[in-house]
């Protein structure tokens, strides 16, 4: 399975540009045979845009997830993307994975928040997600989470 990774600038709050870049990246990756494209932690809005996360975080099933699912289906290429999720009064550093038909396979909230800034804005996640992608059991972890062996069991 070919998995592509987007390594480039974040949209820094420009959602039109963010979804334009997701669309372009999925199209290019799919043409090259990728089955999945992975975008960075908090790609939507940008990692260092903490004031925007508080202001613009969206709920599960909101417009951002709908657009991501639509683009994955359009290009027949899976997508894993980091975003700020609002659940009532809490905000999570989250990531969602969509398969090539636009179905959401997994959703994860970062458990190991890093540093005082993340901890001041985001709530701690408390569960894992696993799913099967093209016959392979897989999961989502976000950045600092990978430093803790207990997440691998």
What are these regions (language model features)?
Residues 1-5:
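Extreme N-terminal starter segment of soluble prokaryotic enzymes
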Residues 7-13:
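Short polar catalytic/cofactor-binding loops
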Residues 8, 82-84, 142:
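Active-site-proximal beta-strand/loop segments in catalytic clefts of secreted hydrolases
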Residues 10, 44, 148:
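Active-site micro-motifs of SAM-dependent methyltransferase domains
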Residues 14-18, 119-120:
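Short, solvent-exposed loop/turn segments at secondary-structure boundaries
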Residues 15, 24-100:
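Cys-nucleophile CN-hydrolase/nitrilase-fold catalytic domain and related Cys-dependent amidase chemistry
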Residues 17-28, 146-153:
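Short, acidic/polar
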Residues 60, 66, 86-153:
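Active-site catalytic loop in hydrolytic enzyme cores
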């Amino acid at each position: 399975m070919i998995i592509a990774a987007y390594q480039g600038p974040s949209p820094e709050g420009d959602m039109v540009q963010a979804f334009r870049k997701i669309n372009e990246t999925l199209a290019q990756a799919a043409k090259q045979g990728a089955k999945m494209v992975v975008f960075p932690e908090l790609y939507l809005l940008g990692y260092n845009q903490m004031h925007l996360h508080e202001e613009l975080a969206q709920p599960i099933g909101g417009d951002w997830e709908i657009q991501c699912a639509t683009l994955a289906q359009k290009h027949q290429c899976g997508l894993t993307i980091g975003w700020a999720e609002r659940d009532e009064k809490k905000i999570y550093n989250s990531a969602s994975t969509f398969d090539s038909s636009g179905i959401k396979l997994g959703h994860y909230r970062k458990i190991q928040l890093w540093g005082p800034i993340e901890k001041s804005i985001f709530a701690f996640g408390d569960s894992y997600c696993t799913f099967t992608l093209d016959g392979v059991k897989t999961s989502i972890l976000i950045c600092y989470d990978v430093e803790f062996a207990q997440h691998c069991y």
